[in-house]
């Protein structure tokens, strides 16, 4: 079994592309969020566009350049989705959420790497656990949104969301380092992107 250093050396170009694309996409979302006063597209329309793009990226056999364009559109629409949070939180809270997100990302990525060094690999069973946990979280969040007097449940779910997406960073770090993506750096960086932006949203709501 190759060591961590062997894995990183073998995948050095792939990892460089993953983090370069991740930086570009996060920058798009952040720029749109900061410099857009009001989203020209409704929340549910944005969500619909994002779901369609995720399905296409996951299932359609399209070249990397086309995936990059679709990912960039997704990042743009997600940035528009984040604009509404500027109306309920101040700039200081957003700044704290950004720093908290980056700190947690670095910490949990380090945990994922440390587990590999310790010979611990998080397999498909752990990935399934995260998926079903996320599905349950989404259902409970919908209940909290439509229900009256469930503010405490909403706070608890926000805390659970922070923990869950932190665990996703650990899992995705191991997947990116050990799984053969066949050069598909877009999908790998999308996994990190979704972890980071969802962690960011939960931290904003928590503030």
Language-model regions, residue ranges each:
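A hydrophobic alpha-helical transmembrane-helix feature that marks the membrane cores
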Residues: 1-207
